[in-house]
């Protein structure tokens, strides 16, 4: 890059803009924009904002036009001896070269600082990446172990589900058996309930009394009078079975079970038939 392609920048630290129009040039080889130059050099004594040098001379601070007109260029150095013109030109070129060099040093400093910061951040990020890689490896191991545990739990769940289904089938089977037995018992109970009243009614028809104090009736079956020979019948008392024990005097009613009552009826009926024969 040639010197002509470089642009002078304001030497104020917080400004750093490209100069155009008017600028303030100091004897300490610094240059400032019109805004900051007029603001900083309005005080007395003037202090250079870049190097803190005291600028007390009359020509230590000059406000100059960066793009002078053709008339100014034709007249500013007119009448001066060549060595004076060359001296002025050499000093102006030295100022320009110093500004470009300082700007490059400043940019190199910023670049070096940024590069150091970048390396530091790269180192930090490298350490973080390594730490994250270790964590990732650890987490992958945990995920693998958790997958194994999950497979074991799935297997256990499958086994337990099969056992539960088998238990449910057994339960349904037992429930069906229980329901069938219950219905069977209910049917038998209803059938016995319909038979018992009919048996009780038949005992009443045959003339047998109910209760513990009931006694078998006397058999009044007529038999022929063998002594008289007149063909008449006479009644002879006959017990079909042994009379029951007398009922205690302190009970008013006494009931026997249907099975006991049925047994008594069967015995009386057999005795009656034998007597008839």
Swiss-Prot record:
GO biological process, one term: chiasma assembly
Pathway recorded for this protein: Protein modification; protein ubiquitination
EC number, UniProt record: 2.3.2.27
Superkingdom to which the source organism belongs: Eukaryota
Keywords annotated in UniProt: Chromosome, Coiled coil, Meiosis, Metal-binding, Nucleus, Phosphoprotein, Transferase, Ubl conjugation, Ubl conjugation pathway, Zinc, Zinc-finger
Main location as per UniProt: nucleus
Tissue: Highly expressed in heart. Detected at intermediate levels in liver and kidney, and at low levels in placenta, brain and lung.
InterPro entries with a match to the protein in the record: CCNB1IP1, Znf_RING
Compartment(s) where it occurs, according to its Swiss-Prot or TrEMBL record: Nucleus; Chromosome
Stretches annotated zinc finger (RING-type): 4-51
Ubl conjugation listed as a keyword: yes
Coiled coil feature spans: 127-182
Post-translational modification: Ubiquitinated; autoubiquitinated.
A single Gene Ontology CC term: synaptonemal complex
Catalytic activity: S-ubiquitinyl-[E2 ubiquitin-conjugating enzyme]-L-cysteine + [acceptor protein]-L-lysine = [E2 ubiquitin-conjugating enzyme]-L-cysteine + N(6)-ubiquitinyl-[acceptor protein]-L-lysine
Gene Ontology MF terms: identical protein binding; ubiquitin protein ligase activity; zinc ion binding
Complex and partners: Interacts with CCNB1, UBE2L3 and NF2.
Function: Ubiquitin E3 ligase that acts as a limiting factor for crossing-over during meiosis: required during zygonema to limit the colocalization of RNF212 with MutS-gamma-associated recombination sites and thereby establish early differentiation of crossover and non-crossover sites. Later, it is directed by MutL-gamma to stably accumulate at designated crossover sites. Probably promotes the dissociation of RNF212 and MutS-gamma to allow the progression of recombination and the implementation of the final steps of crossing over.
Protein name, entry field: E3 ubiquitin-protein ligase CCNB1IP1
Organism, as annotated: Homo sapiens (Human)
């Amino acid at each position: 890059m040639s010197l002509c392609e470089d642009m002078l920048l304001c030497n104020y630290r917080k400004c750093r803009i490209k100069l155009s129009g008017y600028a303030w040039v100091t004897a300490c080889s610094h240059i400032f924009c019109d805004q900051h130059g007029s603001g900083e050099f309005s005080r007395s004594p003037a202090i250079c904002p870049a190097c803190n040098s005291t600028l007390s001379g009359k020509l230590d601070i000059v406000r100059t036009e960066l793009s002078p007109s053709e008339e100014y260029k034709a007249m500013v150095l007119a009448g001066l001896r060549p060595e004076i013109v060359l001296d002025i030109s050499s000093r102006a070129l030295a100022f320009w070269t110093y500004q470009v060099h300082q700007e490059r040093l400043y940019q190199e400093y910023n670049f070096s600082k940024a590069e150091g910061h970048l390396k530091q951040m790269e180192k930090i990020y490298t350490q973080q990446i390594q730490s994250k890689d270790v964590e990732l490896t650890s987490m992958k191991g945990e995920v693998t172990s958790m997958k194994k545990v999950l497979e074991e739990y799935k297997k256990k769940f499958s086994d337990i589900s099969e056992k539960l289904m088998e238990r449910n089938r057994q339960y349904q089977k037992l429930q069906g058996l229980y329901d069938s037995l219950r219905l069977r018992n209910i049917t038998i109970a209803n059938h016995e309930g319909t038979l018992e009243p009919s048996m009780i009614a038949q005992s009443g028809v045959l003339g047998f009394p109910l209760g513990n104090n009931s006694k078998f009736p006397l058999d009044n079956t007529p038999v022929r009078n063998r002594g008289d020979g007149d063909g008449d019948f006479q009644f002879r008392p006959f017990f079909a079975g042994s009379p029951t024990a007398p009922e205690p005097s302190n009970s008013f009613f006494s009931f026997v079970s249907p099975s006991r009552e049925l047994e008594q009826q069967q015995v009386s009926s057999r005795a009656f038939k034998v007597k008839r024969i």
